Amino acid sequence: MISYTSLIGLVLASVMFFCVPKLSKLEKPPVKKEFFKSFKDILSNRQMNYLMLISMMKSLITNSSCILLPFLWKAMGHSPFYIGFALFLFVFAGAFSSFLSPKAEKLFGSKPVVYFSMLATFPMMVLFALTYKTHSVLSLVIFFLIGFTTMLAQPVTMVWAQRTLPEYKSIVAGFINGFCWGIVALCMSILGAVAQNCGIMKVLVLLSIVPAISSYFVKFLKEKKNESD
């Protein structure tokens, strides 16, 4: 039998099909660019390399925190509800900071936002390491702030990359949101093995140093205004 949720999904899909504006048949087809040429242009662009590095650092903290910490909390005897709530706070904080990111960029500029996002993660992770055993509520607040801080620069990085190579906007988005995160995901099995032998919290604190060190390359980034600005 079809469940109620499936019926709701079918209804919503039908509404989207009939209500979302269709692409005009008179619209000129987009100019197709050579696939390998676009990859070469992106990977050979130094500014794009720096931006992809920043995106990888964001993914490094996000993925390692969301994957490794549940095992730590489970070993400490925390309930599944506590673990799920902690992850919800982290993801919600990231979504909220992504929403505020454009406003922060207009107020402070692109570079200060990226600097803050990459440098502030390390001291917050140290505070989390000092409180997660004895002050569970306070550690959740700090974990929320880690999620907020880590993801604050993600939209800025995305827009910055698209402004760098506006002719490859969609492919650039794939690199920032897909390729960079995929590279980090491939490393997670190795990080998991290291964490099992050395300790999860030690690994997370050490990993949080990497974005702070990588923030050195932010100074080489050049500001690029949007065409509509």
What are these regions (language model features)?
Residues 12, 54-63, 90, 94, ...:
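Hydrophobic transmembrane alpha-helices of secondary-active solute transporters
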Residues 1-18, 203-220:
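Symmetry-related core transmembrane helices of the 12-TM Major Facilitator Superfamily/SLC fold
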Residues 46-98:
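Extracytoplasmic gate region of multi-pass secondary transporters
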Residues 97-110, 195-196:
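Helix-to-loop junctions at the C-terminal end of transmembrane segments
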Residues 20-54:
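Juxtamembrane intracellular "pre-TM" segments in multi-pass secondary transporters
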Residues 162-200, 207:
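A late C-terminal transmembrane helix in Major Facilitator Superfamily
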